[in-house]
């Protein structure tokens, strides 16, 4: 096997990897020995020294040694084995819920045991639940680990011990086989070599302290972080270059419809809206597909900008598709566009997952014939049976609910006669610059950084649920004496439409009893679109005082007379989502308030997050704080959307590297195309690559 490249050596060549194990390893993206070596530890455990039992603190992971005092099996609510050990300084209880007779026999009274686990405070003092343990021989000194112990990302059926044994074999192969050096020589010089970095991170030497690795600043980590960030940037550059090779239909200046729409509006667009519209129109006049991200804070008027872009395509006789993440938001867009476009003689169509039978078929036929020029909907728009007729512009609202792959699917779908549609992505969740530079590096960015005149900042307060009756009085006062309208938003931890609907219904019933003088509406995700629309319309027209809702009203609802919002359990939502919700009030000239009605006690993190909302109404400031508190994965929504997760890099911790990474990535992309592609393939599974 000497001299072979490790990306060509299958894991099945390692001892202990048969067909069943291969299948399990493939589930976590491990196929070759190189994949295994790049499957880096999530964290490390320090098992190099003993802790006296008396000094154990809750939450500390520690190795202890002691003599077994007793072991018992109990049959209470759940079958359990407990074993108490003592080291002379104190007593530790080990609890096991999964055990067998051999374990019970091995933990006989008088035996010496070495155990590792997380210390907790139990009923009878310190305890560990399911610690790893080893029965010691008669040796007077315990057999401790000499180096830090790696803990790997794993999946069902693959134990840590298995991954450690396989990694040992992979590291041995690193002595006789090669792993390609993909960094240009001028960059690799002076850095730790790749084999040395991998050895260090999989099996840290005894001299290496845990604190060094936790900081992410060790040279071995920096070497791999650089490679991984480069791979992601190169993937974006490849996507960008790929798009530039495609042709789009140039849509030159023709402002007939645009001028008609602007003349019909009761307001004048802001300077920022005009500037961003000009940037979009410039891109759409080119013969390469526009790929532009429009960021705008809540209420900045992105929908009008999207409408003006749509008119540029429609005036040329082409179709436009707008995709929104939820049916309610898609309905809202459809209504807005109908109000604006139907007086101009433009047919607006609507497609969503809930449409069935003849209505759906009729809509699809109208789209395929070109009768409908503006199509609004959810992801149902890019299902196979939907055929377009001259699709020239794709607008995607709330980008990071979809992810790169879904927007590429819609883009590919629009290809006709060798032309790809222009693409406009809108997000009301401002993206911190660090993330925009990595996750959206394939897009040009426009920012609508000006709110329409007459908007007033929302005052936000956090109040414990124990003062619920005071808040109900406040709602009564706002709705009866001040003539205002209010929202009451219910949130749930579970991602369940049914449970959310039940919670909202219960709150609705409670508030109807407490506020009989008010007309109170209810809207949630399980209602039929027509029902939701009827309630929203009644609220918008002032027929209801108070609207009880789930987070379905997060985006797109515009009721200028509403000036008070109560958000229950705000600690369950991210800052960006709370900021979105809050954006439903403060849309008129009157002073508006948002009450964060939380359950005590709040964790320190939750306190910090709610304080950010009280301090700021600026979406970009809030997004940066959200990044610092929650981390990039949650902020970008990558848990759901399949955007890339990182193996060793951390966008928050490593943000200072991003400008250098971008510069180096451009250099490699231009000068070393083969290495660029190899870096992408090394670090990014096919499902996560951005390139087509």
Enumerate the predicted regions with their spans.
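Long, highly charged, low-complexity intrinsically disordered interaction regions
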Residues: 1-14, 23-26, 232, 242
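Inter-lobe coupling/hinge segments of SF2-like helicase ATPases
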Residues: 275, 289-611, 667, 671-675, ...
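Structural detector for short beta-strands of small beta-barrel domains
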Residues: 58-79, 117
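N-terminal pre-P-loop "Q-motif" helix
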Residues: 267-290, 304
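Short boundary/loop segments of OB/S1/cold-shock single-stranded nucleic-acid-binding domains
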Residues: 42-62
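C-terminal accessory region of SF2 helicases/translocases
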Residues: 589, 601-692
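Upstream accessory/linker segments immediately N-terminal to the RecA-like ATPase cores of bacterial MutS
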Residues: 74-264, 638, 671
